């Protein structure tokens, strides 16, 4: 199944799950956001760690969240943290990202 098809109707649940882990501003980017995804593509998501949660969200939390999201939508999920991203990469992503 294409990621763009897998998330159809699940956007609210995806957003709530990401926010339950303490992240804010969840966004979709990559091939699913551009509409050129295919079966076998992963789902690229971007979220921000707010200042109040700095140092409280671990890599284990991120991995666990990715697993929960994958179970929810049935396709591989790659969650990127905006705070840790180089500026040039974030600017590139911002051109195609879609708010969930």
Residue map of PLM features:
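Catalytic core of pol beta-like nucleotidyltransferases
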Residues: 1-25, 33-35, 39, 52-100
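Short hydrophobic/aromatic beta-strand micro-patches
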Residues: 46-50
């Amino acid at each position: 199944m294409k990621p763009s098809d897998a998330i159809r109707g699940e956007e609210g649940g995806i957003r709530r799950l990401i926010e339950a882990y303490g992240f804010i501003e969840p966004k979709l980017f990559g091939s699913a956001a551009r509409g050129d995804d295919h079966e076998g593509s992963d789902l690229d998501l971007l979220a921000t760690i707010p200042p109040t949660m700095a140092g409280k969200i671990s890599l284990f939390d991120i991995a666990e969240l990715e697993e929960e999201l994958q179970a929810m939508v049935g396709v591989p999920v790659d969650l990127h943290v905006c705070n840790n991203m180089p500026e040039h990469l974030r600017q590139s992503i911002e051109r195609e990202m879609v708010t969930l």
